[in-house]
Design a protein with these regions (language model features):
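Long, basic/Gly/Ser/Thr-rich N-terminal segments
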Residues: 1-86
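Hydrophobic anchor at the beta1->P-loop junction of P-loop NTPases
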Residues: 92-94
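Conserved lysine of the Walker
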Residues: 102
Length: 449
């Protein structure tokens, strides 16, 4: 996708519905109150329209005379920041099974990248604060608790709800995933940015979205994976029986208790099948998209990989003035850690490794250990036991049926909360930095030897 002489891209790809259109078809949201209805978004939503009048500053004027600054896709009418008319998009899709810790990991990844990327000579900021509001709330929950003794727990990614938008098209309701958008620019050595930036577009996938029948024309919630420039597969060792047996005798971490959950190989197989289907590929074709396999909860199983802390994945090089330094990713360290993680999967889950390497280009697969929290979950003190009331079947009131049908607690052992003061992510910035290195290496050049 190239830029035209007026610094606009030839095509914009909507991050919501993936419709491609020229910049002059970008719609604007009306601001006049009489237009508080949109036939795609529904009642209470300001109408998206193609403007014919503009202010000298380039803002649209709606038919009621309102000045309009917010822009939308001409097809789905969802938000499309004007930035996407100038900056090419780097799309990153993350997927994994329920309980793999994706919610924590996404919050930790975005938070640590925003904190660390400046040391690499790159700036990062929200491309649209409204679109990123969910992730920002997760970050606040994880990293901005008032007390170090506060307990932290995040809601999982649901296959409906706040993580998705609903629109009306052709008399049918369609569900679309919400993207998270970040503007990234190089700046080191310049007083201002080079304006050769990118828009990083991050998608999350609920594990339930890979169940049979979850993906269809009215619910195309995983279709963005076929458009992704990089895929992040969260492979959770704590869900695998072989890993659990290897760790249970050596670790008191509560994440090794209970039964193994899910079938991560089946989920990976289904995700790969969908990508091939969406791209009209043959079942035997290899997917050429870079794949980063993330092994989360590293703090719980690190003794399987190393007896020491992970090394710093970068080199610091002084700048010419000598007053400061800039970081360069140390690809030798990344590849060495990737090799060790690969061997670990080969030892404990060889069938999955064979599936991964048979599906993707082996030269574009990287394995990374990460920990969103850097610590184990804690167990809360149990509440005082209450007198159990068992309704009599002889005079059972219909309202008492709720007592009999109540679902068991999802976390019967009381684990799953984290102490805020113990949270210290490990390599959480590396998935997105590695994705950026693979797709746009000019942002993270190699250090000169």
């Amino acid at each position: 996708m190239t830029s035209s002489p007026n610094n606009l891209l030839e095509k914009i790809r909507c991050p919501n519905c993936w419709h491609e259109f020229p910049p002059d078809q970008l719609h604007f949201y009306s601001t006049s109150p009489e237009f508080a209805f949109d036939h795609v978004l529904g009642a209470g939503q300001q109408r998206a329209f193609l403007p014919s009048q503009f202010t000298p500053q380039g803002d649209a004027i709606d038919p009621g005379g309102g000045i309009c600054t917010e822009t939308a896709c001409p097809k789905c009418h969802l938000r499309v920041p004007r930035l996407l008319a100038q900056f090419p998009t780097i799309a990153v899709s993350i997927f994994g099974s329920p309980g793999s810790g994706k919610s924590f990991l996404i919050a930790a990844m975005t938070h640590t990248v925003m904190q660390q990327i400046v040391h690499y000579g790159v700036t990062a900021e929200d491309a649209d604060p409204l679109l990123n509001a969910i992730v920002r709330d997760y970050e606040k929950t994880l990293f901005q608790q008032a007390s170090p003794d506060a307990t932290v727990q995040l809601r999982k990614t649901e296959d409906v709800g706040d993580w998705y938008n609903k629109i009306q098209q052709r008399g049918r309701t369609k569900t679309l995933p919400k993207p998270f958008l970040y503007r990234i620019d190089r700046f080191w050595g310049n007083k201002t940015a080079t304006h050769e930036g990118r828009c990083l577009c991050l998608y999350d996938n609920a594990g339930e979205s890979f169940e049979p029948g979850a993906e269809n024309e009215d619910n195309p919630v995983t279709r963005h994976m076929a458009k992704a420039d990089t895929l992040l597969f969260v492979y959770d060792p704590t869900q695998e029986t072989a890993f659990r047996r290897a760790c249970a005798e050596k670790s008191s971490d509560p994440q090794w208790r209970g039964q193994a959950r899910g079938d991560q190989t089946a989920l990976f197989t289904e995700a790969s099948k969908r990508i091939r289907d969406f791209r009209s590929m043959r079942p035997t074709d290899k997917i050429d998209t870079p794949l980063i396999v993330l092994l989360p909860k590293f703090d719980a199983w690190k003794f399987l990989l190393t007896d020491e802390d992970l090394p710093k994945p970068y080199k610091e090089v002084p700048v010419e003035s000598g007053a400061s330094s800039i970081r360069f990713l140390d690809t030798d360290i990344l590849l060495d850690i990737s090799r060790k993680c690969r061997l670990l999967i080969k030892k404990y889950q060889p069938a999955l490794l064979a599936k991964i390497e048979a599906t993707f280009n082996i030269k574009k697969i990287i394995f990374l250990p990460v920990s969103a929290t850097g610590c184990s979950p804690v167990k809360e003190s149990p509440p005082e036991p209450e007198q159990e009331v068992v309704p009599s079947l002889d005079n059972l009131d219909l309202g008492d049926l709720d007592l009999l049908s109540e679902d068991p607690p999802s976390n019967p052992d009381g684990y799953g909360h984290f102490r805020a003061g113990d949270i210290n992510p490990i390599w959480a910035e590396m998935p997105l930095l590695t994705a950026l290195k693979l797709v746009a290496p000019q942002f993270l050049p190699r250090a000169k030897k």
